[in-house]
Amino acid sequence: MDVHSSDPSPQPSHPTREKVVVHAAYPLWRKHTLVTLARAKELQDAGNQVAVTYCNATAGTCAVNYGGSPIACMICRNRVKKTAEALGLETIPLSVDGSVDKQLPEILFSEKRAVMEGVQSGVISTFRTLPEESRRNPMIAAIKRRYFRNASRLLKSMKAVVKDRQPDRIEVFNGRHACSRFPIIAARSAGIPFTTLEVTARQFPIVCPGYMVHDRHQIQERILSHPADVDVAERYYLRNRQPRDNKYARKHRTAFVPPDASGYRKRISVFLSSQDEFESLGKEWVSPFLNYGPIVEKACLENPDMMFLIRFHPNQADMASDVLTPFKAVSTLPNAQIFYPTDTVNSYALMEWSDTVVTFGSTITIEACWAGKAAIMLGPSFYDQLEIAYTPKTLEEFGDLLRMDLKPKSPENAARFAHFQEFDHDPLQYVKHTGRTMIENGFRIRHPWLGQLARTTDDLICNAIKLWANHASRSRKSA
């Protein structure tokens, strides 16, 4: 049943030997290193000439080392080098010292902008701040400058490797943050293909030739290639509601007591999303519906004959940016009730209560479709081309849809999505699955405890900065 597992990724046979550069990004993160080096070894076994590049910084700033720790850098370098060498893989260190700035090739303005987008993506994801807040925070702004400098030098070094080695393809894990985006920028600059690697929600490897895993257009094409298996979908959506299988269902176990909706023509549930998650994905994910508070307030005011229940996403509880103040006006309206990020009311019961479900791109959209609910989805998402919800382009279209008696969309593509979630992955020879997670198969990632220690230390530093950013944001709002 593994639709994409019979022929994992384009792997040339010996007669079509290719030169492939695989960059080892995020060396402190176990699954990233596991998938990257397992993939590199498999490519080499298939007859390809493979070289593994890695960051040679001594006190660099990146997505796994925002604190710029020299110890973390030492662990990163040694982890990649020793693990790769044990696998018989050639390694190439990428220099990031000051001398790189004076070397050719130059970095184009468009390439610098792409690096900066990668920096912004990483910073937003880690510190949970929206772009405006991160610009105001001096500590985060300083981190961004160091991160940009490090990634820019990595790009120059990678371009030099590409010029020298003339590879046929570059591969890298993820490709979203600056420290994994620069290989893709180098590939595009040289006019050669790239491949990105990732891990699925069920902890299996996935290979994306020519696109990144957050490319929603390509991912939706992949989803649509799956069968609409009703039995698989039934099991998948039922399991999602079980506390033992879904961390959000586990947190949201409080019984939903519906408000008195007598006198209202329609019951609307509104499910918000974490704005920072969309902001971190780049310009392709820019939404015309980003200002949630005013949008919801307008809908409530224009439709006094409808009852609106608004559910914050639990992930919004950890955001450093202030997401609650924009909903102060909504909280005073007679036809609105708000459930905040830390509220534990059952989201599925809230969805079932509704006549129409409104989302800002969250997974409840596809859950609503499968449950036979009419759903309106505002903004881009991994489901916006699956025909599982109504997708207005403007506020006016949204208002018109709210006032219509909408019919539920066909659940066929919701079933395809379930099959995609359950079975879509690309098995790798040197990766084994325990039933819960991935482990090495036939090799060993070096320095596991040192890597975990360095990662935990950086997490503590980042959490402290995030708390400070949160405090600063709220202080400005109350001033």
Where are these regions (language model features)?
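C-terminal amphipathic helix plus adjacent low-complexity
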Residues: 1-14, 216-265, 395-479
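Conserved N-terminal ligand/cofactor-binding loop architecture of enzyme catalytic domains
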Residues: 1-19, 23, 42-152, 199-252, ...
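A donor-sugar binding/catalytic signature common to diverse glycosyltransferases
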Residues: 35, 179-181, 342-390
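Donor nucleotide-activated moiety binding/catalytic core segment of transferases
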Residues: 149-163, 283, 306, 315-366
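Conserved nucleotide-sugar donor-interacting segment of glycosyltransferase catalytic cores
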Residues: 154-209
